């Protein structure tokens, strides 16, 4: 193999990175396409039809924001304080899912260049071991060039895997930060609606009876 023995783990890292990138890309695409529209619909619907809003959330329970809202809205007779605590605890429970695979991404980004460097050293060692003082035979020259080629290929492979993974990891991190800010905003909105709803029991009875 052109990159030497370190090409094997680097190839494994590249395949793993591709699989993780595809999973995260699908996850975030679903959130971007569906979640904001769902939250807006639920906020409007809850003012007039709370059971209908809860039913709509249950239909989209695969989305993090739907699970967060359900955790609080399904509490019977919750005070505004209890409602807020339920939102906060549900938000904390969803954060690991939003940050999923971050550790693996960082491992690939960190280890891949080191493996490339290791391949460089092994390739140079092979080149030096093939050199014989005063010898200019074809076999000797082939061993030297083969070792240098191994050193260069392993370095390039390590850098390519690390750089490509870093770019996607940064994109996913920016999506996570944006989503976290939206969660703070949207949980605040549903809490405000619930407080108004809780403070007007006659409106609540009317909406529930509809």
Curated annotation (Swiss-Prot):
The UniProt record lists the keyword Repeat: no
Signal peptide (UniProt feature, chain positions): none
Lineage top rank: taxon: Bacteria
Main location: membrane
Keywords annotated in UniProt: Cell inner membrane, Cell membrane, Membrane, Protein transport, Transmembrane, Transmembrane helix, Transport
Membrane-crossing residue ranges in chain numbering: 2-22, 104-124, 152-172
Membrane disposition: Multi-pass membrane protein
GO aspect biological process, one term: protein import
Entry GO terms, CC: plasma membrane
Compartmental location: Cell inner membrane
Function comment: Involved in the TonB-dependent energy-dependent transport of various receptor-bound substrates. Protects ExbD from proteolytic degradation and functionally stabilizes TonB.
Protein name: Putative biopolymer transport protein ExbB-like 3
Organism: Synechocystis sp. (strain ATCC 27184 / PCC 6803 / Kazusa)
